[in-house]
Every structure is written in structure tokens, then in C-alpha cells.
A protein has these predicted regions:
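Loop/turn elements at helix/coil->beta-strand transitions in domains of secreted/extracellular proteins
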Residues: 92-94, 149-156, 180-185, 204-206
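Sec-exported extracytoplasmic/periplasmic mature domains
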Residues: 83, 87, 109-110, 146-154, ...
């Protein structure tokens, strides 16, 4: 899962004006002070608005019945479709690829902490969260993936988590009852590699790859 950090900065042009007119009238200084105060108020209002928006988004994700319903619907559709596909024999084993964050694992507690701290995503805090291995499975993911595993489907997790986070991620998945078919089935981000497409192609070369069911579960 990645979060875009937005930085909003207002640079006051009044600073140079105040220096140049330090010998001016008290009226001018008063006007400049009021203008500077107004700009500070704009900054606070914007920051407060952004914080409120982030809070509402996280609360909706965690509490809204629609969130659970959408995940369950997506994974139910994926399960039905997989059942149909498995009726057709294949020389290669069938496989599926999924992302992890917000597709299999729910990282909203990490987002909640960011809201409380007034911070955005950063790699250091994210790594601390991953090491806790406490993310819960999103609704429907466990049943779908267990069905796939029990029916001989190869499951690959293609994620932009780093390779140093593989062990903690395996620990988290196993705690949630999510099938892990080997370390080589967790295809994480390596130095110099950004695109997931190359990893998908590597899976496709040795298996009969069935798309990416996570697309059915994506919340739009």
C-alpha cells in the first residue's frame, strides 16, 4: 500500500517588505501585521481541513458497512470465476497474483496513527508497522485464498513492500490464516526494480496465470 505526501507551504512576501519599511508609519506596520496574521490563518485552516479529510476517510474505511460489503462482493465474484476456470484442464498449474496492502491486508490502523500524529506516510514508520505483523485480513480474502490453495492454485503476492520485510509479512499472513506457499511466492520490491509487470511476467512464464482478482476487490 502507498500514500502520497502533500506539502502545502505559504511563503510570506511580507517579510522583505517589513525589513524595507521598518522606519515607516505605524499604520503601515499594523496593516502588514494583519496581512501576515491572515496568511497564517489560511495555513491553519488548510491544515485543519486536510486533517479532517484524512480522519473522515480512515473512519469511513474502518466503519462503513459498504467497505466490508464491497470486499466480500469482490472476493465472492472472484471465487465463482475461479471455480469456472478450474473446470478446464491445464498443462501448467493455474496461478493468481495479488497485491497485499488493502487487497489482502488491512493497514488502516497505521493510517489512524498517522492521523493522530498529524503525519503522512514515511518509510521508517511504515517499516515499524510492518514489523508488528498485526494487520488483519480484509473481508473475504482468507476464504478466497484458502479455496485457491486447496484447489492447487499457485498464489503469488506481488507487492511494493521491500525484500527486507518478507519475514514479517509471512508472519502476519500466517497469523491471519492466509496461505503462504513459499518465500518465492512473495515477490517484493528489489533495488532498481519499480514495475510490477516484470514480476507478473515471471509468474506467467511458468504457470497458467489468471489475471489479478484483486481488481475485482478494488474500492473505487
Amino acid at each position: 500500500m502507498k500514500t502520497t505526501k502533500t506539502t502545502f507551504t505559504i511563503v510570506s512576501a511580507l517579510a522583505s517588505v517589513i525589513l524595507l519599511t521598518s522606519c515607516g508609519s505605524n499604520t503601515t506596520k499594523t496593516q502588514e501585521t494583519k496581512a501576515s496574521s491572515t496568511k497564517n490563518q489560511v495555513t491553519m485552516t488548510y491544515d485543519q481541513q486536510r486533517s479532517q479529510e484524512n480522519t473522515m476517510s480512515v473512519l469511513w474505511y474502518q466503519k462503513a458497512a459498504e467497505t466490508k460489503a464491497l470486499y466480500l462482493q469482490g472476493y465472492n465474484v472472484a471465487t465463482d470465476r475461479l471455480k469456472e476456470i478450474l473446470q478446464t484442464p491445464s498443462d501448467k498449474p493455474y496461478s493468481i497474483v495479488l497485491d497485499l496492502d488493502e487487497t489482502v491486508l488491512d493497514n488502516s490502523p497505521y493510517q489512524v496513527q498517522n492521523v493522530k500524529d498529524g503525519t503522512a506516510f514515511n518509510p521508517k514508520d511504515w517499516d515499524v508497522w510492518v514489523k508488528k505483523a498485526t494487520a488483519k485480513a480484509v473481508p473475504g480474502a482468507k476464504d478466497f485464498l484458502q479455496y485457491a490453495d486447496q484447489n492447487g492454485v499457485q498464489i503469488y503476492y506481488i507487492s511494493d513492500r521491500t525484500t527486507s520485510q518478507v519475514d514479517d509479512t509471512i508472519k502476519n499472513l500466517e497469523k491471519e490464516g492466509i496461505p503462504v506457499q513459499g518465500r518465492d511466492h512473495l515477490m517484493f520490491l528489489e533495488d532498481g526494480v519499480k514495475s510490477k509487470e516484470g514480476r507478473r511476467q515471471a509468474v506467467q512464464e511458468k504457470t497458467n496465470l489468471w489475471g489479478q482478482p484483486s481488481r475485482l476487490c478494488r474500492l473505487l
